[in-house]
Amino acid sequence: MYEICYISIPLYNTSTYAFADDDQKAEMLKLAQAAADSVNAAGGETVSDQVSALHEAAQNTLPDIYAVLDGETSDDSASVQTELLTESDVASAFTQDGAADALRSLSYGEAAAVQINSHTLLLMVRVDPLSVSSLDDLRSQILSDMKGGELDDALAAGGAELAHDLDSSAINRLPAKKIVNNSANS
């Protein structure tokens, strides 16, 4: 389970929708990584400090990042979002080579710039999920992550073992001609 605070940076001009070429992506990633380095240098002790440092770094760097594609930032470009990601979320969203591993390698409070797919770059800081939510709030997610697959397998195996006997007296009480499909009558 990964809790991240992030700012999403599109790898395209938001006015013309012209995508960045490889050189432009590299330049944008370099600028975003410099912002992540400044967040790490700030060394925030609390999540609030880390989010403030991320927001400040984004406000200072986003105009330069957007300028690579001749774009302009909007009022909400530096808005920090928070997301709790499961391992399956990471696998499905972080599709760029090495992106998922980059997230997994971050320690709590560490910031990085990661290109997660062909059109999005994240400036993010990983935070401790228990510093944002209580254990009770996270309990179902933790259990699902830890034992969800085993539970699915156990339910499937138990279902496969059930006897498939039809109760003839129940069938005689309710013959098929008495069953009315309400959705077909409306």
Q: Whereabouts are the PLM-identified features?
A:
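PPIase-associated folding chaperone regions across multiple families
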Residues: 1-38, 89-186
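Peptidyl-prolyl cis-trans isomerase
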Residues: 38-96, 137
